[in-house]
Amino acid sequence: AGRAHFRVCTVVAEAVAKLVADIHRYPDPRAHDLRAAVAAHWGITPGELAFGNGSNELIDLISRVFAGGDDHVVFGDPSFLCYRIACVAGAVPFTDVPLLNGLAWDVPAMLAAVTPRTRILFLSNPNNPTGAYVGGEALRHLLTSLPHEVMPVLDEAYAEFVTAPDFV
């Protein structure tokens, strides 16, 4: 009891042994190898990438760097709770735009919520927790309608689950 009936695959055992030998080391805080690989995959420079310990950390970092004081942030409601948490933690005023009946995004209302003080618009696409998404045409309209002072943050954590042809 308590033991598997099958032996561990040799390749797996060797990989685990190699990793365990370095377990006492801190990871590269700048993620140089990962940064280079992702940049090469997407055809961008490594300096265009930021990595963190999950989206919560990155959302908090974005909020702290790009919004503060009398600035303003826009996001949907309901949507990923970390947008609200980051704003409250940083004492940044925000507008949470209600989703439409059926929990669809209200792109016109999102744009209407933007003020001269707005610096960030968070869009969880597809939305967490509802799964609603903004299709390609509506997303292009949203992004091209935002003032240049507003940074759109597209949180696409669940994009791989969307199979709709109009999702970009």
Regions found by a protein language model. Give the residues of each.
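Short acidic capping loops at alpha-helix termini that bridge into adjacent secondary structure
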Residues: 45-49, 70-72, 117, 149, ...
